[in-house]
Amino acid sequence: FASQRLFFALCTYLMFRGKRISYLELLALLLATIYMYQQTSTTSPFYLSILILTYVLFSIKIFKKEFIIENFWLKKIANYGFILALIITLYFCFYSSGNLFHLVDQFTHNRLRLSVEGFRNFGVSWLGQHIIFTTMDIFGNFTSNYNFIDSSFVQLLVIDGLIVSTFMLFALTKVMKYFVSIRKDIVLACLGIMIIHGMFDPQMLVLRYSPLILFISRLFIMNSDNNIE
């Protein structure tokens, strides 16, 4: 999981440095991303890391423009990014056409299919449930009945239940609205990349990877003088 750790570390570093980031730092982050991809061949964190580094380069260094904050529609999308991501994930799972479903499933290495199977096998309860996923056999090989749910959003619903999911979406939406209100463009871009990552990867709300839980814990004491960006 080194590639996932690097991805979240990169996003966290970009959020902390913000407009103070230098070309040398961006180059170092790019080289670290390329090296990690060569070692692990993990595509999702690699492509998303390249995307956010490109955004930061164009936003801060080349055009010196806050693309999200200065665009009315992107600002609205940012406010409700987590809710929109959940809606899109559920649409892909239950309402997308056969061709679109198979395209997304293939692009995400069967993770969409596993999300659908997770809903069918375990369902969604109000208070959540304890689930033991079947992943590998005693020899370390993937089993034929592998059923791990990779999507952070689907995990939230299936494992934590509707009540916790509602609270988490409410809290995360408050976080997004806060950063929109204080015009933290790079922070919003990084959070947006994390949201996209979380649609098909399970680390978004895991503390040892992602800072999102820390943002929620500081939700009611955040102020415009903090050190983020």
Annotated model-derived regions:
Residues L31-Q38, A85-Y91, L191-P202:
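Aromatic-anchored segments of alpha-helical transmembrane domains
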Residues F1-L10, I149-S152, L157-G161, Q203-Y209:
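Membrane-interface micro-motifs in multi-pass membrane enzymes
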Residues F16-L26, E66-K75, T173-C190:
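Membrane-interface helix-loop-helix junctions at transmembrane boundaries of multi-pass membrane enzymes
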Residues R17-I21, I216-E229:
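A juxtamembrane structural motif centered on a specific transmembrane helix
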Residues F1-T40, S44-F58:
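Alpha-helical transmembrane segments of multi-pass inner-membrane proteins
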Residues G98-D160:
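Long extracytoplasmic/lumenal interhelical loops at the membrane interface
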Residues Q38-Q39, Y55-V104:
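A membrane-periplasm/extracellular boundary helix in multi-pass inner-membrane enzymes
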